[in-house]
């Protein structure tokens, strides 16, 4: 059995350097994986880092541990751009990236940004991606 840590990409963890240091510490402690959330909205103004920027820092700060996002809401991303980002991170990490995709959380992460909030539509977008 393998064990991984997962952390948010906001609040105290809204800094790529902090996440990269924690991933290095997790690797040294023997953990198998280090995953971060892919959220973009909060009720409060708090520090937040793009998960792909953070994963680049994590990839360069670790050697063995598997890395990735817990779930990236594919309907919120352009598939070609996400493909380019994941290939880049996978190369930086020497093949240690795992990509989890889904439709994302509730409407609070979508309607504030003018994105599609309907779950059926997001599901169709996930299938298309």
Predicted regions and their residues:
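N-terminal beta1-alpha1-beta2 module of alpha/beta enzyme domains
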Residues: 1-61, 116
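Flexible, glycine-rich active-site loops centered on histidine and acidic residues
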Residues: 2-15, 75-129
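Active-site-proximal glycine-rich helix-loop-beta segment
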Residues: 30, 63, 93-95
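Conserved beta-strand positions in the central sheet of alpha/beta enzyme cores
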Residues: 35-36, 66, 100
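Glycine- and other small-residue-rich loops at beta-strand/loop junctions that grip anionic moieties
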Residues: 44-47, 71, 122
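Conserved catalytic cysteine-centered active-site region
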Residues: 62-70
